[in-house]
Swiss-Prot record:
Keywords: Actin-binding, Cytoplasm, Cytoskeleton. The gene is arx-4. Functions as actin-binding component of the Arp2/3 complex which is involved in regulation of actin polymerization and together with an activating nucleation-promoting factor (NPF) mediates the formation of branched actin networks. Seems to contact the mother actin filament. Plays a role in time-dependent memory loss and the retention of conditioned behavior over time. This is Probable actin-related protein 2/3 complex subunit 2. Component of the Arp2/3 complex, at least composed of arx-1, arx-2, arx-4 and arx-6. GO terms for molecular function: actin filament binding; structural constituent of cytoskeleton. InterPro entries: ARPC2, ARPC2/4. Gene3D superfamilies: 3.30.1460.20. GO terms for biological process: actin filament polymerization; Arp2/3 complex-mediated actin nucleation; epithelial cell migration; morphogenesis of embryonic epithelium. Its main location: cytoplasm. Disruption phenotype: RNAi-mediated knockdown suppresses the memory retention defects of the msi-1 os1 loss of function mutant. GO terms for cellular component: Arp2/3 protein complex; cytoplasm. It comes from Caenorhabditis elegans. It is found in: Cytoplasm, Cytoskeleton. SUPFAM superfamilies: Arp2/3 complex subunits.
Length: 301
């Protein structure tokens, strides 16, 4: 299985290039790049007001207002400090600004933090409910994040656990079958590792935890994946790794479904080619009459 990168590769490469050029004393070059990420996220790297000595990175998330209810702004200010603009670029939710004339000697941490902007936006809601669990607080309203147009994430804290539920829509009947097989591997994985979180999967109807939500989607192509996170997954030492892995689980699942379909199609095409070769070798040659230059006929064997 492939673990998706937590840091956006385009941001890493562009910022490393621009920062290296600035530290070497090179002439600043203009940049204006817009690109997409999973979950409908949109990024933009550009120069503010045409000033090539500065670079701004902006992100747009359709569900950012829901994350703001769980402290997203405060967490981002804590992580990015003075690099976070008080007013984001028009059409975006968050904007970071970097002065190429005032860079630290080592820009590695700067680049890594910037390329994890989407992850850090997501982190606020997880950290909030992890803290509820650590303090033994129950009864807080369940967090509902509509991270895609037809898919939702639910988070709820208990005194001994945090439950994270993803609803996802399978576009194809084949995806449902492959998804079920794939998720069964998570259950098997827990048998091999007792420290892994419990993973439950239901198809068609929401799990019992969401029975009180009439808006929870129902349908043959709707799946619900439930993670039960215990204190060993949510404590201060392990929470960052947990957030890294779980916030992108939906993308991870569908990415592997697509990879599995590609693999199956490739194998099927290879088998078809092999069968055609066998059939061609087994095909009998057709006997036919041929004539010589003088009009005599003869049969080919």
């Amino acid at each position: 299985m492939i673990i998706l990168e937590q840091n956006n590769r385009i941001i890493v490469e562009l910022l490393e290039q621009k920062f290296a050029n600035a530290k070497e004393g090179g002439k600043p070059e203009s940049v204006n790049v817009t690109f997409a990420d999973f979950d409908g996220v949109l990024y933009k790297l550009s120069n503010p007001d045409g000033d090539r000595t500065k670079i701004i990175l902006s992100i747009s998330l359709k569900f950012y207002t829901e994350l703001q209810q769980h402290g997203a702004d405060d967490l981002l200010r804590r992580v990015y400090g003075g690099h976070m603009r008080s007013t984001p670029e028009q059409g975006f939710n968050v904007t970071l600004e970097y002065n190429l004339a005032d860079l630290p000697a080592d820009t590695t941490d700067l680049v890594q933090a910037a390329s994890a902007l989407k992850r850090n936006c997501f982190a606020s809601v997880f950290e909030k409910y992890f803290e509820f669990q650590e303090a033994g607080q129950e009864g807080h309203k369940r967090a509902v994040i509509n991270y895609r147009d037809d898919e939702t994430m639910y988070i709820e804290a208990k005194a001994d656990r945090v439950t994270v539920i993803f609803s996802t829509v399978f576009k194809d009947a084949d995806d449902v079958i492959i998804g079920k097989v794939f998720l069964q591997e998570f259950r098997e994985g827990r048998k091999a590792s007792q420290t892994a979180p419990a993973v439950l999967y239901s198809l068609g109807e929401p799990p019992l935890e969401l029975k009180d939500l009439p808006e929870a989607r129902v349908g043959d192509n709707v799946g619900y994946i439930t993670f039960v996170l215990f204190p060993r997954h949510t404590n201060k030492k392990t929470k960052d790794n947990t957030i890294d892995l779980i916030h992108s689980f939906r993308d991870y699942l569908h990415y592997h479904i697509k990879c599995s379909k590609v693999y199956l199609h490739t194998r099927m095409r290879a088998k078809t080619t092999d069968f055609l070769k066998v059939l061609n070798r087994a095909r009998p040659e057709v006997k036919g009459e041929k004539k010589t230059f003088h009009g005599r006929t003869f049969q080919t064997q």
